[in-house]
């Protein structure tokens, strides 16, 4: 908004920024604060998480109001707003994560838009969160009518279950088994399938936390046929790689997240995607857990390690240092 055209009025307070770089406040469009994942509760709530964000210049976050099974979207939004009550030190907003779909939920989407929720997240993995392809198709149609944007966690949940079963039968229980349960094709297949569904509906969509070259190739093919696809990746996929799953003494559990860390080749492809404008946003997917009291729950079984790593504080410095 242009308030006034003319000479700048004398300031009441002047900060000397000589030799410094001035940025607008950064936005982290993908965080998970005060969230019960079904396995553990995240270590950060909205108080500690937003304070950490501000330390390095993130002044706005967008978290997820996640619907529990059997819960209405209205109740879910109220619950998540209650979590933020008098706790947030920075600006915040919500995407709505839809985990169940029926006519009642469908009827609530207009109320969500009137409440300021115009973006929605769906999961293709995690039994307590994921939806089938038919529900994804119906939600995309409803979102199109409302002018909303749908983002999706693209991993093939059925194949993850099959791989995990095989690994456990082979007595592979260390953190190294986690990336083996989610090879790059697990992401690429889900991205390709989701984009085909979106093509049928003719609606813009958002791919969250892209981690693989194969996934980026699927997105390129979709764009060539005219689809509008917005893409997010995260610092962990740009700066960390799969070698960290070979650390000793359970240290690799610190890097158990989904999608998992990938190869150097995948890293290079993602950086190229950023340079070419194929990836629009770098968010954190901040989902922090305490190593001693939470990650170590899975010391004898990798499937019990809470998935997620932090990032809400360090993203600006990391991306400026390695990406500018």
Where are these regions (language model features)?
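Histidine-rich, glycine-flanked metal-binding segment
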Residues: 1-24
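Hydrophobic faces of well-ordered beta-strands that scaffold small-molecule active sites
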Residues: 25-31, 61-63, 92-96, 118-122, ...
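His/Asp/Glu-enriched, well-ordered alpha-helical/loop segment
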Residues: 176-202, 254, 281-282, 288-324
């Amino acid at each position: 908004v242009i308030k006034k055209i003319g000479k700048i009025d004398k300031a009441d307070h002047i900060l000397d920024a000589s030799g410094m770089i001035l940025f607008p406040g950064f936005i982290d469009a993908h965080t998970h604060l005060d969230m019960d994942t079904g396995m553990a509760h995240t270590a950060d709530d909205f108080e500690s998480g937003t304070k950490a964000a501000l330390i390095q210049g993130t002044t706005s976050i967008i978290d997820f109001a996640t619907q529990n099974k059997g819960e209405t979207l209205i109740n879910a939004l109220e619950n998540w707003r209650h979590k933020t009550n008098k706790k947030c030190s920075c600006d915040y907003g919500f995407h709505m994560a839809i985990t169940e779909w029926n006519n009642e939920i469908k009827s609530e989407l207009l109320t969500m838009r009137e409440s300021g929720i115009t973006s929605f997240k769906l999961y293709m993995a995690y039994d307590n969160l994921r939806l089938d392809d038919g529900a994804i198709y119906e939600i995309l149609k409803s979102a199109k009518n409302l002018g909303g944007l749908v983002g999706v966690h693209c991993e093939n949940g059925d194949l993850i279950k099959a791989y995990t079963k095989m690994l456990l039968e082979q007595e592979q229980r260390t953190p190294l088994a986690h990336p083996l349960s989610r090879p790059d094709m697990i992401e690429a297949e889900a991205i390709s399938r989701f984009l085909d569904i979106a093509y049928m509906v003719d609606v813009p969509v958002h791919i969250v936390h892209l981690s693989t070259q194969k996934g980026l190739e699927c997105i390129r093919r979709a764009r060539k046929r005219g689809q509008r696809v917005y893409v997010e990746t995260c610092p962990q996929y740009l700066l960390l790689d799969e070698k960290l799953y070979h650390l000793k003494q359970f240290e690799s559990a610190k890097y158990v997240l989904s999608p998992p860390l990938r190869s150097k080749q995948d890293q290079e492809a993602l950086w190229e995607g950023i340079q070419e404008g194929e990836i629009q946003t770098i968010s954190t997917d901040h989902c922090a857990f305490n190593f001693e009291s939470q990650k170590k729950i899975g010391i004898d079984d990798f499937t019990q390690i809470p998935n997620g790593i932090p990032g809400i504080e360090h993203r600006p410095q990391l991306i400026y240092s390695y990406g500018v």
